[in-house]
Amino acid sequence: MSNVTTIEKLDSILQEDKWTRIVVNNYSLAKIKELDDLINNIIDEGLTEDVLDICGRHLKDVKKSIAGLYISGMLIYSRRPLNDMNLLAVIDLFSQNLKWALVEHICNEMLLISENKHALYTLAKIYAQNNENDKLPGIWTRIVEADIDDTVFVRQLATYYETIDLQKSIFYFRKAIYRFIDKKQMSGIREVWAKLIHYVSDDFDSFLLILQKIEKDLGFKKAIVLYEDLFDHYSLTDNVDETIEILKGILKLDNKNHKARENLVKFLRERYKDVKNIEDYLVKSDIENLDKNFVDVYLDFEKYLFFAKGNFVYHQTWSVGIVRDVNDNGITVDFVSKRGHFIGFDMAMSALSPLSREDIRVLKAVTPKEELADRVKKDIEWAIKVIIKSYKAIDLKGIKKELVPSLMTQSSWNSWSLKAKQILKDNPHFVMDSGKLDCYIYNERSSNLNEKMYDKFKIEKDFYKRYEIFINYCNVKGIVKDLHIEEEMLNYFLIYVNNFTKVDHHVVSSYVILKSLGNFSEELSSKVNIEKDVNLESLLKEYPKGIVDLFDSILNAEIKKELVVLIKEELSNWILYYKELFPHSVNKRLVESLYKEDPREVEKLFNYVIKNYKIYKDAYIWILKHCKAYSIELSYSDSDLLSNLIKILTDSVIKINNKNNSVASKRIYKMVINLLVKDGYLKSVLEVVRDEELAKRVYMTCFYVKDFPPKDLLEIKSIIRQLFDSVEFEDEKMQLAGERMEIGFLTILSSLNKKQKELKYLKEVEIPENSKEIGKARELGDLKENAEYHSAKEKQQFLTKRLNSLMLEIENAKVIDTKDLQSSVVGFGTKVVILNEVTGKDESYLILGPWESNPDEGIISYKSPFGENLLDSREGDSLNFVINNTNFKYFVKKIEPIKFS
């Protein structure tokens, strides 16, 4: 068929369509199918733009032309499914005239292109009218997947499957309740809530997750209503512990709920009926007093339960203790560092915390260290469980703090933690605490992993965190995955791609995620149905800003990597994008692809980055690390490149000290120091240029930066010394040769590390614990007679004084490289053998600083009176001096540098 024939046929059809009302009544299914054939011809012959122009002019004259609306509507819709206005107008005209067969056909044609919500809802209406009940579940399912706001059909699906497939029914009830929560429809929430209580009452934790979301989104009053519904069910079962948790949940939200307090006392009596003094504990804790804060009185009640003979307790200062005796006045506790300590009940309630026998702190106190460390290393799951249960909720940093260095080294932790992370991800007993960021809780009831992941996905609001949950779910091994949950997560990203009105980083990220699914699951990838006109080229054209802004907006490194891959796979002008990206997003694949295409272009890029190294620090560091892999001529000397790198290094230290973007600065610092030392860049450059002055300048530039990490400074010095063994550094003149200078005091690296650890412990542990002690003691009143308060205040004064002293010492300390110590004269870092001419015996001393001084071990500070009198003496010198009216006479026999292990 020629172009002319197709256009002529179109003109003929449009003329027939002139009198709309008559045409609508006379339209048949055959006529619509004839239009479908014409539309296919128009697309095949590339006449879309011409036909849209013709139809546009026609519709100005005949606004309700069926043919004009349908042909133009389908052509536009096939390009961009969101633009369905003309087709909806046709559907509306036929619906008014009860042409349901035609409406059904048009809806099905639209659905071949995209899951159009209006078409789906219209088909559901038609099937219901025609009593085609067998078709309804299928169309309801498609509506639920296409319309995340639907609450009608998701509930109908759940009800439909109740007697056919209960697991599928529960899945849709779960989906329904989250949608009702999002819409804040309390009647729907309660209806579905009742169903979930009936069908999955054994999954108590899923109810708590839903309640947390309701409290957050709808307020505590609505949450209480659902708590009470849950109580009505659990109170009639044998689940006493869960019932108590429900009542505690109510009272945390509504402190003065009298009925809940009464019921709580009733169930506590049942739960602890075997405890001898349970009634006394209930009375003493005053748990039914509505004027008292529930959380406080319940904590008191729990403490009374635990203050029984043989139970363990914890005190901020005295650590773990065991209750040895209980009487009417209080308890006697044997602490690790304080035996037989009597504490009155009032003080015990505020100062002590109960510990279970399986608490990690108890295990540390009562189990031999080697035995406990061995079990922790071998039974990782047990160790994680013990630590999490000890603290109720804890993150990986907290777990590390509990284990390193007390039970394992840092290097052991590195491998141990990798296995621990996998267990936390896969084991259904370990659940993320929605109330605390990155914290885990232990769930005695094994959660269904599918439901656990689904609940996490639904509760999470952040796009990129949802992506991480989705990918984790895709990667989980050893379980049968729920098809509906997997598709629900997948659909979240599909909606972004197929139903956007404006392209943002979420849309592009979703496209990248969907296109890269083959890396994880071919089966899942086969279910991805992206609209045919949506591709990376069209998305980037519609993105309102440039590719650099897009990369900055994408908050996931894996998505960025996959986007780099897709740019080359899908775009003919990928080189332009890669050139623009490189200084901002360092990527080896990107550079190698550019280099294969045009090495000279890469050379220009590298030189541009070097010229602007202060702006493109990441790219600059990457170039220095990898440039030897490419045949590139740089416009800068090795000396210049090294000097620039040192400027980046020292600038990062200054920013860290000033807390100026310290996270990014720490990252840059680590990258540079690794390049210089670990990757051997400093050594390789100095070997080539053989410039001793440059080497000295590198070291001294770092030396004069305040708080430059001593360990790294010594590494730099050591590398330089290997290449220039006779080099003299300015800081060495401050050592103890004839030109001594006061610069605070000298020390060795290990001593500084110990002092820094002491300072950290003081700041992060001792002072905060002391503040808590003061607060608890103050709550008891009567400060004049309060011995605990006065003791804590005295300790506060001591800690403050020690803090100030330690900070000043660390600031004034200068670390000396033990490899470069001089031994021609007595000075810091030397061992001296002297003859005592009074006793006739040889005496041997190590000369170090105030931090290392230990006269009983023969270690003398060079700043002590005795040490100062030995300084600068040489072998063969005779020494005569007086200290505290005592005469000393020595002959210097031997001087040598101290050998540090």
Curated annotation (Swiss-Prot):
InterPro entries in alphabetical order: GreA/GreB_C_sf, TF_GreA/GreB_CS, TPR-like_helical_dom_sf, Tscrpt_elong_fac_GreA, Tscrpt_elong_fac_GreA/B, Tscrpt_elong_fac_GreA/B_C, Tscrpt_elong_fac_GreA/B_fam, Tscrpt_elong_fac_GreA/B_N
Domain GRAD1: 171-681
Annotated coiled-coil segments of the chain: 784-815
Highest taxon of the lineage: Bacteria
Record Pfam families: GreA_GreB, GreA_GreB_N
GRAD2 domain ranges (all copies): 20-170
Region annotation (GREA) ranges: 741-901
Keywords in alphabetical order: Coiled coil, DNA-binding, Transcription, Transcription regulation
GO biological process, alphabetically ordered: DNA-templated transcription elongation; regulation of DNA-templated transcription elongation
Gene Ontology MF term list: DNA binding; RNA polymerase binding
PROSITE patterns: GREAB_1 (PS00829), GREAB_2 (PS00830)
PANTHER family: TRANSCRIPTION ELONGATION FACTOR GREA
Family: Belongs to the GreA/GreB family.
Functional description taken from the UniProt entry: Necessary for efficient RNA polymerase transcription elongation past template-encoded arresting sites. The arresting sites in DNA have the property of trapping a certain fraction of elongating RNA polymerases that pass through, resulting in locked ternary complexes. Cleavage of the nascent transcript by cleavage factors such as GreA or GreB allows the resumption of elongation from the new 3'terminus. GreA releases sequences of 2 to 3 nucleotides.
Stated name of the protein: Transcription elongation factor GreA
Source organism of the structure: Borreliella burgdorferi (strain ATCC 35210 / DSM 4680 / CIP 102532 / B31)
Gene name as annotated: greA
